[in-house]
Amino acid sequence: MAADLLAPWTYYRRPFRIYGNLYFVGFKPASTHIIDTGEGLVIIDPGYQEFLYMVLENIRILGFDPKDIRYIVHSHAHLDHAGATYALKQLIGAKTFMGENDCSIANGKHPTLTCIGNKHYNHFEPDQHIHDGDHIRLGNLDMECVETPGHTLGTISFFWNITQDGRTLRAGMMGGAGFNTLSSQYIHEHQLEAEDRRGLYQKSIQRCRQEHVDIFVGNHVGQNDTFGKQERMEAGDTEAFLHPEDWPIFLENLQKRLDELNVSDPL
């Protein structure tokens, strides 16, 4: 689903706390989250530049100051996740993090891989290149970074602990689950045959299966039914996001879709 960037306000959604220090401040189709580390905010995937004014307002609604954003972390470099980064960095000067193999998309060396159609991408040079096994640490946050290529070559998945009322749970986000970049048309148009995108995606599913996740954090709202769970929380279900079974079910569905794609759209 592509967003209508000429009418971003039509996507507005109330911000809310998911669990502990993790908050949703974004919209659809892609998600934006913040983590209050106690020593500053970490924002994951600031989204489209056209949506940034609403993201900043949502951060304020939750009682935080956007100027306290210290780190801007990206799951991958596509426009719907990183389009606002240039403007946000110019505004607050936060440090940017991105998987090393996606930095050439962000900085404009491979502009055709941004998945932007006819939309504009303000390129930027990420400050910190993320590699497999790296940790992003700030205050009470210790976020493990796992390379999970396929959707893009530099896709990064994130896993970290969240504590609330003395209870610590494991949160996890798969950095790129979309199949749009796995189609034969996309691969042939961009001459990506040598990269074995589908093989990489398969290995990334297997890698993510090794992780236990109590709180599945989607980088698109449809992955974990973000808004449905928000509504259940507002109706009184305080543990709407606390379902460890969601993660393996999500990964199994990705595997089924990949198997179907290999049959219906061979390379």
Stretches found by the model and what they are:
Residues 22, 50-53, 60-135, 235-236, ...:
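Active-site HxH/HxHxD metal-binding segment of metal-dependent hydrolases
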Residues 130-131, 149-198, 264-266:
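Mobile, glycine- and charge-enriched loop segments
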Residues 51, 77-83, 103-106, 153-156, ...:
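Active-site environment of divalent metal-dependent phosphoester hydrolases
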Residues 1-8, 165, 182-267:
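Accessory terminal helices/loops
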Residues 21, 35, 45, 55, ...:
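Divalent metal-coordination and catalytic microenvironments
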Residues 2-3, 12, 17-19, 68, ...:
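Metallo-beta-lactamase
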Residues 44-46, 69-77, 96-99, 147-150, ...:
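Active-site neighborhood of phospho(di)ester-bond hydrolases with catalytic His/Asp-centered motifs
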Residues 8-62, 66, 158-179:
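Conserved beta-strand hairpin/beta-sheet module of binuclear metal-dependent hydrolase folds
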